[in-house]
Every structure is written in structure tokens, then in C-alpha cells.
């Protein structure tokens, strides 16, 4: 039976992870190791300055107290799930992780940690907060396909699903990340003692929404699958930097 380590960044009680766990348990052994609270936007943060405590729920799910998604996958793989998983799955996130959003996403980071530790990994996000059953069904279909024929790319699959009934999903597209304009908004308030409080504003407006992007696919009713990689090296820029350094020596 397929062994799945399941995590997220919305917290262990979030409807996305619970809906997905129920669907996956129809054909796989699932161990949830997830934050005890919402840790959205935590990216790849790893807790190094304090100890981590866990709470094991009556059904065997494990909540990591004040843990990040990366903490959860690290602990799940290296300490809490035995035997180790066959694959790491993160989600279902309440809201999309498209374009530049993947930089900040705890959902994507959990999958990234799984891949970094040597396991196949999926990040799953719903473009809304209604049709979690659709996202769960799509995820199960993809996992069954991977079980039948493993995808040997060494990449993370970042999956974004339109917030639609399953019957209205048009298909699946392999995409690249689109991009947004830089975010600029900060909201400032004052507390009753006159101290300034700052709230980070919404993401920037979409910029690159070409037909081959994740933005376009989801907007048009398609599931978007974008392969992502742990290696952030910009290989195409190496010669440019070499030439720049050489010119400095002249």
C-alpha cells in the first residue's frame, strides 16, 4: 500500500487537509504531520532556536506545536513516520499558489522539503475555498497514476485546481509559473497606546499571464501542473556573470 506523508500550511484542522486525507485513505496509508495553526506564507522557514513539541490526536494525526510546514515534513520523514513515506503531499491549500506566490508558500515549501529529503512530492492548492472534493479527486487521480507509472523527473509537482465542480474541470495542462508586479501596499494603524502597527497588503497584480502559464490554465478551468525544482541555480546566467567578472579585471 502506498505510504503518504501529508502536511500543509493552513493547519491540521483545515478542511483542505482533512478532505484530502479522507480521500487518500481509500487506497493509501496516510500519516498527517501538520502545523497546529495556520502558518500560511511561512515559506521554507525551519525552527532552529527552540524545541518542537507534538500532539498526537486520537486518530493518529500529529500536530506540531508552532511548527512550520518545513518543520513538519522534516520531522515526519526523519522521526515520526515509520516506515518512511513513499511520497510527500502538501495541501489542499485554501487558495492558489500560482506564479510568484510559490516563493512565499508554505504549501509549496512542505513539498520542497520532501523533495530535498529525497522523496517525490506534490503541492496541491485550490483556487478558492469551496470545492475541496474536486481537488481531492484530482490529487487521487494523479497519485494513482504515479503509483502505476512513477514520474522520474526529480521535480516537485505544483498543482493548482480551479474552484469548480469536478464535472466542470476541462482537463490538465502542464504549465510554467506566471508572474506578478511587485507588491507595494502596507497598511499602517495605531494601537491604543499610539504604537504603529503594520499589515502587509495583497500581492501585486498579475503581469505574465501568457497562455502557457499557471495563471491562464486555472483561469480557463484547467488544472495546472508546474514542475518545480530545489536547485535554484540560474545556469543560463553563469556565463554572463563570468564575462562580467572578467570585464572588471580589465
From Swiss-Prot:
Query: What does the record give under GO molecular function?
Result: 3'-nucleotidase activity; 5'-nucleotidase activity; exopolyphosphatase activity; metal ion binding; nucleotide binding
**PANTHER family recorded for this chain?**
5'-NUCLEOTIDASE SURE, 5'_3'-NUCLEOTIDASE SURE
For this entry, the protein name equals 5'/3'-nucleotidase SurE
Q: Which cofactor does it need?
A: a divalent metal cation
Matches recorded under Pfam families = SurE
What's noted on cofactor binding? Binds 1 divalent metal cation per subunit.
InterPro entries for the chain: SurE, SurE-like_Pase/nucleotidase, SurE-like_sf
State the family named in the UniProt similarity comment for this chain: Belongs to the SurE nucleotidase family.
Keywords annotated in UniProt: Cytoplasm, Hydrolase, Metal-binding, Nucleotide-binding
* Positions of transmembrane segments: none
Q: Does the keyword Metal-binding apply?
A: yes
Provide the function of this protein.
Answer: Nucleotidase with a broad substrate specificity as it can dephosphorylate various ribo- and deoxyribonucleoside 5'-monophosphates and ribonucleoside 3'-monophosphates with highest affinity to 3'-AMP. Also hydrolyzes polyphosphate (exopolyphosphatase activity) with the preference for short-chain-length substrates (P20-25). Might be involved in the regulation of dNTP and NTP pools, and in the turnover of 3'-mononucleotides produced by numerous intracellular RNases (T1, T2, and F) during the degradation of various RNAs.
Q: Which catalytic reaction applies to this protein?
A: a ribonucleoside 5'-phosphate + H2O = a ribonucleoside + phosphate; a ribonucleoside 3'-phosphate + H2O = a ribonucleoside + phosphate; [phosphate](n) + H2O = [phosphate](n-1) + phosphate + H(+)
Listed binding positions for a divalent metal cation are: 9-10, 40, 93
Entry GO CC: cytoplasm
